[in-house]
Swiss-Prot record:
Top-level class of the enzyme under EC nomenclature: transferase
Family the entry assigns: Belongs to the P-Pant transferase superfamily. AcpS family.
Residues at which Mg(2+) binds: 7, 56
Protein name: Holo-[acyl-carrier-protein] synthase
Molecular function terms, GO-annotated: holo-[acyl-carrier-protein] synthase activity; magnesium ion binding
Keyword Acetylation found: no
Alphabetic keyword roster: Cytoplasm, Fatty acid biosynthesis, Fatty acid metabolism, Lipid biosynthesis, Lipid metabolism, Magnesium, Metal-binding, Transferase
Catalytic activity reported: apo-[ACP] + CoA = holo-[ACP] + adenosine 3',5'-bisphosphate + H(+)
Its EC number(s): 2.7.8.7
GO-annotated cellular components: cytoplasm
Cytoplasm among keywords: yes
Job description of the protein: Transfers the 4'-phosphopantetheine moiety from coenzyme A to a Ser of acyl-carrier-protein.
Gene for this chain: acpS
Length: 123
């Protein structure tokens, strides 16, 4: 069985949220590693928007939506073949309880938008 989630995020929305709420916003949503990666690039808000979309897409694929899962329970890391998801806390618990055995993440972005799709499956 497969489960999927998709999300699209306006890059400017992420920048405006950071400007409005400051570091508090960033530290509520992103892990230390995600922030270090994003701000080491020329376009940090593009990277942050892609990770925000990934977290939303993964929460949808888990079947919970982001309301029940903490944003930081879903982490995006750079794997050898592209972005990968690492689940912590409640997200890891739900992934295991639902019997998922694998997950895949794809990110894409342009200047103004970022999109993510997440697929999970059971063997």
């Amino acid at each position: 069985m497969y489960s999927s989630g998709i999300d699209i995020v306006d890059v400017l929305r992420i920048k405006k949220l950071h400007e409005r709420f400051g570091e508090r916003f960033l530290h509520k949503i992103y892990t230390k590693g995600e922030l270090e990666y994003a701000f080491s690039t020329k376009e940090p808000y593009l990277r942050l928007a892609a990770r925000f979309a990934a977290k939303e897409a993964a929460a949808k694929a888990l079947g919970t939506g982001i309301g029940k899962v903490n944003f930081k329970d879903i982490e995006v890391v750079l794997g050898t073949d592209g972005p990968e998801l690492i689940f912590h806390g409640y997200a890891a618990k739900i992934f295991q309880e639902k019997g998922f055995t694998g997950k895949s993440l794809s990110l894409s972005h342009e200047k103004k938008v970022a999109v993510a799709i997440c697929v999970m499956w059971r063997d």
